[in-house]
């Protein structure tokens, strides 16, 4: 089953077979060993997935959660390929998929939303994929959220297994080819070591193929005949030629871990960092009394219809200068919101210091879930006021950064805010709107 001399055409055919979910008897993409020629390991087994495979072998109902950003969210991507492989490879086990992905978001939002999006559904295995979207965050910030994710999962159920999976974008390709994980994955590896969580770097194989000249990382398939084209945008794998590589790597190491079985509850050791976000809370606004200046969006509103599964309630100000006042004791306050054509500017005052926050960017020609944080605060009492002035600004100039033109000005006429929840590490002391 170990293919060493695959030419590009044969390799491409292999990828198509995986993507079409055929019985996985000959669907390897030359993932020869745990360590690539550069000496960079793509897999660390550590404690494996014993509880997951115990249930699989017994044919019991098994729930698999995929937790990450747009790379994992992709409809015809590694998520669906690996989940379909599980169903085919273990036909006597009923599998349920939990798709807990949100494009463009990292582990800093994930740790807050996971109670609703994952834990309420009682998963048996959670794949965690945030290496690309956590780019730019400090090691300490990644530790806070990623360690919080682990500890929340095991507090909810110590028999839930976790597997870290790492992806890559073009900006870290050379680093991986030089034999080093990107900084985000290096930080996550230290956490995985601490908690003995298995990890799979799907990007190591991609980097190897690119270095050997078999793969073009970013390009157009029609301009690169005879080669695998991984992506057209430097990040998101193509469903026919990029995602199957990711899927084949994960499949290989799931197979390698399947003999390590048994009911082995995971204990919680002393945390790596004391200020990790295991106490993070997603706070609902539904308990607030009615306000003349705020309203809950109706069920038929376009934003509610798009995001009701993860955001059951979404609120917006109805008058200019509507205000939200929050008092809390803690280190972090965030806002889980939706940004898009009708979103605008916020005036945020933290402990008397005022700042303008723009909830509109060059991608806001469509609506998407997002978040904004006030973090790194002292663990003390803080007061925050958010005012929504609804003043206009040049949205066309912002969209022009991506060569997007406003063809219907009415879609962008409002300058409001779509708020779903507060995100808090600490204790809420008071909350009101007026």
Label the predicted regions:
Residues 150-186:
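Active-site segments of SGNH/GDSL-like serine hydrolases
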Residues 161-166, 182-228, 244-257:
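Extracellular serine-dependent O-acyl
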Residues 44-53, 83, 107-120, 143-152, ...:
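Alpha-helical scaffolding within the catalytic cores
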Residues 74-108:
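Mobile, glycine- and charge-enriched loop segments
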Residues 70-73, 102-108, 132-137, 160, ...:
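Solvent-exposed loop/turn segments at secondary-structure junctions
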Residues 63-67, 96-101, 125-130, 161-166, ...:
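Structural recognition of the beta-strand scaffold that forms the well-ordered cores
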Residues 65, 77-80, 93, 107-143:
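Oxyanion-hole/transition-state-stabilizing segment in secreted/luminal serine hydrolases
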Residues 1-67, 72, 77, 87-93, ...:
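N-terminal secretory targeting modules
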